[in-house]
Amino acid sequence: MKKKLKVLLTSAPTIDMEAFDKNINQIKGYVLYPPISLTTLAGSVLKKVDNVQIEILDLEFHIMKYFKENQESELEARVLMEKLIISKIDEFKPDVVGISVLFSRSHSNIFAIANIVKERNSSIQVVTGGNHATFAYKKILDECSNIDLVFLYEGDETFPKYLEYLKNNTKFEDLKGLAWRDKITRAPIISHHAPLIENLDPIPIPAWDLIPLKEYQKYGYY
């Protein structure tokens, strides 16, 4: 029996880790939304790809939860984020880490996550996607050598096909909606754009069972 392909999905926090205010987190709390982009993508993968195991690491949730429950902790948010990522990498041992980045203010956190993952295990494929990644793909590929691929526009169709490529060694040239680096020049290359999803009905229900959904209002607000 083939080994399951392990996929870890996470998102680049919108909060600046250097400016994270523990008092605000404790008294008022930060905005904390359940990561529907990650759960929807996970649902698509589980429906379309066989023999795959997915876990979600919502960094904002775990950071806010930790500081709510450990008021006297002197740990910095940036250090906690690194510890959370390393712990999950060591425990789950993913083959692929997908980083969702919806907003431009998360830009620096993409690099932080990618660097932590690759330093822990350089064989892991680190990919990113989302609104910001789509429009800043060149900047991302130019500035962070630890990002292997950028998914452009919606990944609900492209990401499952990419995982099939990794599992079954299908033709990389057949994949659409990706940006990567030329092996020689290192210049960004874009494949043909994947068609936009017009009919949303076939998109699976988000995989809410992969996150502690009921706890989100306890540690933040939305």
Residue ranges, per PLM feature:
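Short boundary motifs at domain starts and secondary-structure transition points
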Residues: 1-2, 88
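Short glycine-rich His-centered loop
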Residues: 4-32
